Amino acid sequence: MPEPRRSTIDAGEVERFSALAAEWWNPNGKFRPLHKFNPVRLSYIRDQIAARFGRDPRAARPFEGLRILDIGCGGGLLCEPMARLGAEVVGADASETNIEVAKLHAAEGNVIVDYRATTAEDLADAGETFDVILNMEVVEHVADIDLFVAKCGQMVRPGGIMFVATINRTLKALGLAIIGAEYVLRWLPRGTHQFGKLVRPEELEKALGGASLTIIDRTGVTYNPLADRWARSKDMDVNYMVLAEKGSV
């Protein structure tokens, strides 16, 4: 009898985010923290892609000719800016509800994104490949991080790159990202993050290494409550982002 196929999908996580789908593009709604967080993510992604592929970030469509996957794209908060910068963008999410919201918003703004209700393993098994993969705030929500990273890594073309943003598994992160953000300030619905599923940088580096990806840049991201804004930082105790590269053949 064949073994059941391994999956990266955590059904509870998909259900949780599907229930919030209508809120994706409301900057003052349930995803307000993500809207606040988005500018620092976008600037990091834009600058690093431009540097790695020799593009001028000041050009009108600097990412023309690049194929980008946003895995776990939600409502498309990263897909649309990448498409406006000229990239061919595939936005994938396990939640069909999220994908429908993303499609509707893109159509309203006349932005072309190839949205698909699918998984990393299905895309990888279909032979899809990309110059850039955006893996942002997803690894802490999957059922099998090693399989997920392996399947994503399989889709990165030689010389291509993958961004990963997540939350460190530290007591500081427990206090700020879970207790503070979800239970005290109520920035996020309770249960959005589970402490045991948060990912330490060394764990992420090991998973990436197993997928033939090498970390070439990393940065912390911290919140300034006085300025009400996020910024890059050396402090990786809570939120952090890494950039990993697949070597050329």
Swiss-Prot record:
The keyword Nucleus does not apply. Keywords: Methyltransferase, S-adenosyl-L-methionine, Transferase, Ubiquinone biosynthesis. It comes from Mesorhizobium japonicum (strain LMG 29417 / CECT 9101 / MAFF 303099) (Mesorhizobium loti (strain MAFF 303099)). One of its GO terms (molecular function) is polyprenyldihydroxybenzoate methyltransferase activity. Belongs to the methyltransferase superfamily. UbiG/COQ3 family. CDD domains: AdoMet_MTases. The keyword Transferase applies. This is Ubiquinone biosynthesis O-methyltransferase.
